[in-house]
């Protein structure tokens, strides 16, 4: 740092004093600003994929009062009873999907009923083809591979966006 003229070292009988130079103060201020932006800013991750038909399990779960009420409480909308399944087809989008696993999420907690356990679900606010509100739903217990994501919205997304199997969509996930 001394070679970069960011600090000045003063040696005396009492010891050593290290002071920031004006250039050092500017550099430190720039670092703090970058850290603040990184911590406080809303960032998004883009994921592209193609629409695929699901097995209808999303409809079953989103028809359950527990999930409906939790999603409304957390996301602020009543979800359409069904998810839109998207298969990720390119490397960059799959890498971005994997980033979600280590990104902070909103969470529907696990709920124990008498005869079953309703599993926890991660929620990420999102836009699909620029349409909001929407959310990426990642159940903690799922049969889907990482290359398939599910989207929820208050809208019937296939109708609202005129989508059919094979159509490409862009998901902007806010993390």
UniProtKB/Swiss-Prot annotation:
Gene name linked to the record: ribK
Catalytic activity annotation: riboflavin + CTP = CDP + FMN + H(+)
Record-listed Mg(2+) binding positions: 83, 85
Cofactor binding summary note: Binds 1 Mg(2+) ion per subunit.
Tree of life domain: Archaea
Pathway: Cofactor biosynthesis; FMN biosynthesis; FMN from riboflavin (CTP route): step 1/1
Pfam annotation, one family: CTP-dep_RFKase
Organism of derivation: Saccharolobus solfataricus (strain ATCC 35092 / DSM 1617 / JCM 11322 / P2)
Family the UniProt entry places it in: Belongs to the archaeal riboflavin kinase family.
Phylogenetic classification of the source organism: Archaea, Thermoproteota, Thermoprotei, Sulfolobales, Sulfolobaceae
Function recorded in the entry: Catalyzes the CTP-dependent phosphorylation of riboflavin (vitamin B2) to form flavin mononucleotide (FMN).
Protein name per UniProt: Riboflavin kinase
UniProt KW Iron-sulfur keyword: no
Binding residues annotated for CDP, in chain numbering: 54-59, 155-158
Key words of the record: Flavoprotein, FMN, Kinase, Magnesium, Metal-binding, Nucleotide-binding, Transferase
Cofactor: Mg(2+)
UniProt cross-references to InterPro entries, sorted A to Z: RibK_CTP-dep, Riboflavin_kinase_archaeal, Riboflavin_kinase_CTP-dep, Riboflavin_kinase_dom_sf
EC number per UniProt: 2.7.1.161
Molecular function GO labels: magnesium ion binding; nucleotide binding; riboflavin kinase activity
GO terms (BP aspect): FMN biosynthetic process; riboflavin biosynthetic process
Gene3D superfamilies: Riboflavin kinase-like
Binding-site residues, FMN: 142, 150
